[in-house]
Curated annotation (Swiss-Prot):
CDD domains: Urease_gamma. It comes from Magnetococcus marinus (strain ATCC BAA-1437 / JCM 17883 / MC-1). This is Urease subunit gamma. Its main location: cytoplasm. Keywords: Cytoplasm, Hydrolase. One of its GO terms (molecular function) is urease activity. Pathway: Nitrogen metabolism; urea degradation; CO(2) and NH(3) from urea (urease route): step 1/1. The keyword Hydrolase applies. It comes from the Bacteria.
Length: 100
C-alpha cells in the first residue's frame, strides 16, 4: 500500500485520536498532542459526514472540556486549524478557543 505524505498524516492523527479516546474512557487527562489530535479528527470526520465549515467551527469547541485535559493545556491552545475534505472540496477549518 502506497500512501501520500498527506494520507500518512491523516492516519497518524486518526490513530492519536483513538489513543486519546481510550485514555478519556479510562479517566486519564489528555496532553497537548492528544487534545489536538482528538479535535482535529472530529473536524475531519465531520467534514466527511457532510457537516458545514461553520458548524464544525462551533462544534469543534465542544469536543473537550478543561477538566479532561492536563493543567495548562487549555491555555496553550488558542486555535486549531484543520484542512478537511468536504463534498465540495478541501477547506481550512479554524476552531477558536477549542477547550473551554
Amino acid at each position: 500500500m502506497h500512501l501520500s505524505p498527506r494520507e500518512k498524516d491523516k492516519l497518524l492523527v486518526a490513530m492519536a485520536a483513538m489513543v486519546a479516546r481510550r485514555r478519556l474512557e479510562r479517566g486519564v487527562k489528555l496532553n497537548y498532542p492528544e487534545s489536538i489530535a482528538l479535535i482535529s479528527d472530529y473536524v475531519v470526520e465531520g467534514a466527511r459526514d457532510g457537516r458545514s465549515v461553520a458548524e464544525l467551527m462551533q462544534a469543534g469547541a465542544t469536543v473537550l472540556r478543561r477538566e479532561q485535559v492536563m493543567e495548562g493545556i487549555a491555555e496553550m491552545i488558542h486555535e486549531i486549524q484543520v484542512e478537511a475534505t468536504f463534498p465540495d472540496g478541501t477547506k481550512l477549518v479554524t476552531v477558536h478557543n477549542p477547550i473551554r
